[in-house]
Regions:
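Generic recognition of short, well-ordered alpha-helical interface segments
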Residues: 60, 219-222, 271
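C-terminal helical "tail/cap" subdomain of flavin- and related membrane-associated enzymes
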Residues: 229-339
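Short alpha-helical scaffold segments that flank and stabilize functional sites
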Residues: 6, 51, 223-230, 263
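Predominantly flavin-linked oxidoreductase catalytic cores and closely associated redox partners
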Residues: 1-172
Length: 339
């Protein structure tokens, strides 16, 4: 395991198969030959871009900022979401805020020290900013908004993050802000060029991010398992992933992602959320709507579920997929973005 290295270049043969990847760490260069390459380098996916990934920004995408804070509530077992996200002027934003308790998980710093911390090594904790005897652990606090090329979100996410953190500071006894970052997130499979003869993009790199809440951890774990199973099932050289991997992603997530993208697109209309939000969050229907929304946003509807919410979700997904058959969904690179 060579932690903290950056993949800087790939060498491909005439058929497009990756034969060698060049990694750089602390100025040292290492070339690694490979039979298969699984790319999991996040939403920006620099290696994915080198391999031909294209992001279709006509579809809904997220803009988000996150930070880490010391908090005595870091060991809580619940993730907190705030769906009515307002800016400093009180204007409702098409997004939400979150607080993920992380316990004593390592935050930032040197990758080797972080790995040692996870292993419980003697130098554990050396990487964490602010470490030094504090009983408080860490929480991930962030916020995000939805956007499209036609209706870009007009919000400074870092300013919104500061406002959101200030609003939650007393309840969470937040310490000093650490490691603020922001990014744009392709969502719901709105990318093309995610596979080649012996390589595949997974997780955030393949836009396997829920368009309704920006969540992608479970999709990252699932797609990692799925691509390994696909390669192993083919035997021998692992088969050609160029069409097989997008087809598998489409089978598992296509209907749900297209439906979620369609619903998320509605949230980018300026008048939609102020009109509908209060009904779902505080109206008489909230007791029904909010549990169902949390379930759908959490990717908790399985193929085995037969209740009303699951049936309606699957039926709506099938209808949406048929109606938006031309929308980019891990599509060939020549497919144009949705208008």
């Amino acid at each position: 395991l060579w932690g903290g290295a950056r993949a800087s270049a790939v060498e491909r043969d005439a058929a497009g198969a990756v034969r060698e990847v060049t990694f750089v760490r602390d100025g040292a260069e290492q070339r690694v030959r490979c039979r298969h390459l699984i790319v999991a380098d996040g939403v920006r996916s620099e290696l994915g871009r080198r391999l031909g990934r294209k992001w279709h920004r006509g579809e809904v995408y997220g803009i988000a900022a996150r930070s880490y804070w010391r908090s005595p509530r870091a060991r809580e077992e619940w993730i907190h979401s705030h769906l009515e996200l307002r800016d400093a002027d009180g204007v409702v934003q098409p997004g939400y805020g979150w607080i993920f308790p992380l316990g004593d998980a390592p935050v930032g710093g040197d990758p080797d020290a972080a790995a040692a911390r996870l292993r419980g090594g003697a130098d554990a904790g050396a990487d964490a900013p602010g470490a030094g005897g504090s009983a408080a652990g860490w929480v991930n606090l962030g916020c995000g908004a939805l956007s499209t090329a036609a209706r870009p979100a007009k919000v400074n996410t870092k300013k919104l993050l500061s406002h959101y953190a200030a609003a939650r500071s007393e309840a969470w006894t937040l310490g000093e802000e650490q490691h603020v970052t922001s990014a744009m997130l392709p969502m719901g499979g709105a990318v093309s060029g995610v596979a080649g003869p012996n390589w595949a993009l997974i997780g955030d790199a393949a836009a396997c991010v829920n368009p309704l809440n920006g969540e992608g951890i479970d999709y990252a774990l699932e797609t990692a398992e799925q691509v390994v199973a696909l390669i192993c099932a083919a035997g021998g050289d692992g088969g050609d992933l160029t069409a097989a991997w997008p087809a598998l992603l489409n089978e598992h997530y296509g209907e749900a992602f297209l439906l979620a993208r369609t619903l998320a697109r509605a949230l980018t209309h300026p008048r939609f959320l102020p009109a509908v939000g209060p009904l779902g969050l505080r109206g008489p229907a909230a007791r029904v709507i909010m549990p169902a929304a949390a379930r759908l946003m959490g990717n908790l509807v399985t193929d085995e579920d037969r209740d009303l919410v699951a049936r309606v979700w699957r039926a709506a997904g099938a209808v949406t997929k048929a109606a938006r058959a031309g929308s980019p969904l891990w599509a060939p690179a020549e497919v144009a973005p949705a208008s």
